[in-house]
Amino acid sequence: MEQTLKGDETGWWVVSDAVQIWLPQGELPCGTATKWSLQGKTARQIGEWQEQPVWLVCQGRDTDMASVRQLLDQDVGLFQLAGRGVQLAEFYRSHRFCGYCGHEMVRSKTELACLCHHCKERYYPQIAPCIIVAIRRGEEILLAQHNRHRGNMYTVLAGFVEVGETLEQTVVREVMEESQVQIKNLRYVSSQPWPFPHSLMMAFMAEYAGGEIKHDPKELRDAGWFRYDQLPQLPPPGTVARRLIEDTVVLCRAYHENEG
């Protein structure tokens, strides 16, 4: 439930303008509302971290606003809560008015939703399901440079789930569309909320089954097979992409040792 801060409330503070998050000294603020000049602001508790509440304040600040990506090297639980706050701030920003009748909406007091009292419509935060997959061929892993990524970073293939697809069908389709490679022995690994802007990444590993790499230039700048000990620049630690690559490297090394 939302409440007006009196000043003595304490915990972690996710202060977001729906795009960025407030990170004074590069860290998520912790302490009392008064310490961070938040008294009088409207806040909602969105979770707990280290036995302290995590509060969301939907408001920007004049300084120290940054991407939640800066928290990637923090504990995964803290990053997820910060990402949750940014996604909720964006949800509230984009759902001020009802998409059916145009009337102003109110935030639910009992759940994470926006309500229209005029037409009784109810809106929940959107989540975009995505797959991400590491493909192994012997002692090599398929990595690609995505057009949307800056610098020379290579990562595994990924894409959004389409209407009516299973996750497994999405993996096969995305891999074929982006690389023209066939896969086998697909298995689920883990998932990661990804607040850019509101995705849920579902991670898989697979083995190469056939085909020659022919990357889609609309999606990728480059794609190729890389030996486990000759890898290019990789995604940062804390990402599910990095975990997939590291797990695949273990399999590649074991294959090399067994074959050698």
From Swiss-Prot:
<feature type="binding site">
    <location>
        <position position="124"/>
    </location>
    <ligand>
        <name>substrate</name>
    </ligand>
</feature>
<dbReference type="InterPro" id="IPR022925">
    <property type="entry name" value="RNA_Hydrolase_NudC"/>
</dbReference>
<feature type="binding site">
    <location>
        <position position="119"/>
    </location>
    <ligand>
        <name>Zn(2+)</name>
    </ligand>
</feature>
<feature type="binding site">
    <location>
        <position position="101"/>
    </location>
    <ligand>
        <name>Zn(2+)</name>
    </ligand>
</feature>
<keyword id="KW-0862">Zinc</keyword>
<keyword id="KW-0479">Metal-binding</keyword>
<keyword id="KW-0464">Manganese</keyword>
<feature type="binding site">
    <location>
        <position position="158"/>
    </location>
    <ligand>
        <name>a divalent metal cation 1</name>
    </ligand>
</feature>
<dbReference type="Pfam" id="PF00293">
    <property type="entry name" value="NUDIX"/>
</dbReference>
<dbReference type="GO" id="GO:0110153">
    <property type="term" value="F:RNA NAD-cap (NMN-forming) hydrolase activity"/>
</dbReference>
<feature type="binding site">
    <location>
        <position position="174"/>
    </location>
    <ligand>
        <name>a divalent metal cation 2</name>
    </ligand>
</feature>
<feature type="binding site">
    <location>
        <position position="98"/>
    </location>
    <ligand>
        <name>Zn(2+)</name>
    </ligand>
</feature>
<dbReference type="InterPro" id="IPR015797">
    <property type="entry name" value="NUDIX_hydrolase-like_dom_sf"/>
</dbReference>
<feature type="binding site">
    <location>
        <position position="219"/>
    </location>
    <ligand>
        <name>a divalent metal cation 3</name>
    </ligand>
</feature>
<feature type="binding site">
    <location>
        <position position="111"/>
    </location>
    <ligand>
        <name>substrate</name>
    </ligand>
</feature>
<protein>
    <recommendedName>
        <fullName>NAD-capped RNA hydrolase NudC</fullName>
        <ecNumber>3.6.1.-</ecNumber>
        <ecNumber>3.6.1.22</ecNumber>
    </recommendedName>
</protein>
<dbReference type="GO" id="GO:0006734">
    <property type="term" value="P:NADH metabolic process"/>
</dbReference>
<keyword id="KW-0460">Magnesium</keyword>
<comment type="subunit">
    <text>Homodimer.</text>
</comment>
<comment type="similarity">
    <text>Belongs to the Nudix hydrolase family. NudC subfamily.</text>
</comment>
<feature type="binding site">
    <location>
        <begin position="192"/>
        <end position="199"/>
    </location>
    <ligand>
        <name>substrate</name>
    </ligand>
</feature>
<feature type="short sequence motif" description="Nudix box">
    <location>
        <begin position="159"/>
        <end position="180"/>
    </location>
</feature>
<comment type="function">
    <text>mRNA decapping enzyme that specifically removes the nicotinamide adenine dinucleotide (NAD) cap from a subset of mRNAs by hydrolyzing the diphosphate linkage to produce nicotinamide mononucleotide (NMN) and 5' monophosphate mRNA. The NAD-cap is present at the 5'-end of some mRNAs and stabilizes RNA against 5'-processing. Has preference for mRNAs with a 5'-end purine. Catalyzes the hydrolysis of a broad range of dinucleotide pyrophosphates.</text>
</comment>
<dbReference type="InterPro" id="IPR015376">
    <property type="entry name" value="Znr_NADH_PPase"/>
</dbReference>
<feature type="binding site">
    <location>
        <position position="178"/>
    </location>
    <ligand>
        <name>a divalent metal cation 1</name>
    </ligand>
</feature>
<dbReference type="GO" id="GO:0008270">
    <property type="term" value="F:zinc ion binding"/>
</dbReference>
<feature type="binding site">
    <location>
        <position position="69"/>
    </location>
    <ligand>
        <name>substrate</name>
    </ligand>
</feature>
<feature type="binding site">
    <location>
        <position position="178"/>
    </location>
    <ligand>
        <name>a divalent metal cation 3</name>
    </ligand>
</feature>
<dbReference type="InterPro" id="IPR049734">
    <property type="entry name" value="NudC-like_C"/>
</dbReference>
<feature type="binding site">
    <location>
        <position position="219"/>
    </location>
    <ligand>
        <name>a divalent metal cation 1</name>
    </ligand>
</feature>
<dbReference type="GO" id="GO:0006742">
    <property type="term" value="P:NADP catabolic process"/>
</dbReference>
<feature type="binding site">
    <location>
        <position position="116"/>
    </location>
    <ligand>
        <name>Zn(2+)</name>
    </ligand>
</feature>
<feature type="binding site">
    <location>
        <position position="241"/>
    </location>
    <ligand>
        <name>substrate</name>
    </ligand>
</feature>
<dbReference type="GO" id="GO:0000210">
    <property type="term" value="F:NAD+ diphosphatase activity"/>
</dbReference>
<dbReference type="GO" id="GO:0030145">
    <property type="term" value="F:manganese ion binding"/>
</dbReference>
<feature type="domain" description="Nudix hydrolase">
    <location>
        <begin position="125"/>
        <end position="248"/>
    </location>
</feature>
<keyword id="KW-0520">NAD</keyword>
<dbReference type="GO" id="GO:0000287">
    <property type="term" value="F:magnesium ion binding"/>
</dbReference>
<dbReference type="Pfam" id="PF09297">
    <property type="entry name" value="Zn_ribbon_NUD"/>
</dbReference>
<dbReference type="GO" id="GO:0005829">
    <property type="term" value="C:cytosol"/>
</dbReference>
<dbReference type="GO" id="GO:0019677">
    <property type="term" value="P:NAD catabolic process"/>
</dbReference>
<dbReference type="InterPro" id="IPR000086">
    <property type="entry name" value="NUDIX_hydrolase_dom"/>
</dbReference>
